[in-house]
Amino acid sequence: LSYGPVDLAGFRNWLAQRYQSVDALNRAWGNVFWSMQYGNFDEVELPNLTVTEANPAHWLDFYRFTSQMVAEFNQLQVDILRELSPGRDIIHNFMGRILDFDHYDVGAQLDVSSWDSYPLGFLDQMRDLFPEDHRLQFARSGDPDFQAFHHDLYRATSNGRWWVMEQQPGPVNWAPNNIAPRDGMIALWALEAFAHGAEAVSYFRWRQLPFAQEQMHAGLLRSDRSHAEAFAEAGAVAEMIRNIDWPATTKGDVALIFDYESAWAWRIQPQGEHFDYFSLVFDIYRGLRRFCLSVDMMSPAVA
């Protein structure tokens, strides 16, 4: 997040449009508490430098504002691309467990949503989500549900069309421990994505770099253009899916709402040290999968 003067001016303007009057803002935020009433919108500061704890409503509106700015910037680029390259699908890639903006708003502007799937990197990196014994158990295969959760979530953001934009092909360079996948996992991860409705699975990288920041990040080819371990598995999947009669997309057994504003509210004022909205919904998702139920993620706006 940015907290500069341009952000402050934009936030004040956004509040003025949202509430129309400062009295309406004071009522909505409950500013009578601690005598926090504003006389005009120019008195509102950003929530990061308040003398004491900021009003939770102040923070929540700031998150709403910054999320809308992300969506507006994306829309600006979408409009340019649609004008200069009409008739083509527009796609953008999201990430795992990123809650800083409402992905439904951005996804609605796209033809195809996608995300970057790094099963081993995410497992070892997200240590607050995965305890040590769990990380050791799945160190070379990735958490059994994390990828599926995001497949279903991002499928919901752009009316069912989605890709894996970056699929892990081997050890990465950015996790605490960059472990090689177990034999067969490259193929399994791709097949899992297709089973969740992916139109495409794209690997990052095609060829490993011999220099710079990501030179230790594996590709389907090594830097000398020889085949890395993942090359054969990716090729096998390509042959496999040519001969699979994929069923028509159907509704899941269960709908599960994922709400970004709820995630922000939990972050702003958690009622326990380890309260985390993502973890709550993820645990529910895990439980549904244990009962062999397919899950459709939904925005609260369409629930």
Set out the residue ranges of the language-model regions.
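Polysaccharide-binding and catalytic clefts of secreted carbohydrate-active enzymes
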Residues: L1-L153
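Carbohydrate-binding surfaces of carbohydrate-active enzymes
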Residues: Y38-V44, Y118-G121, E132, L136-A303
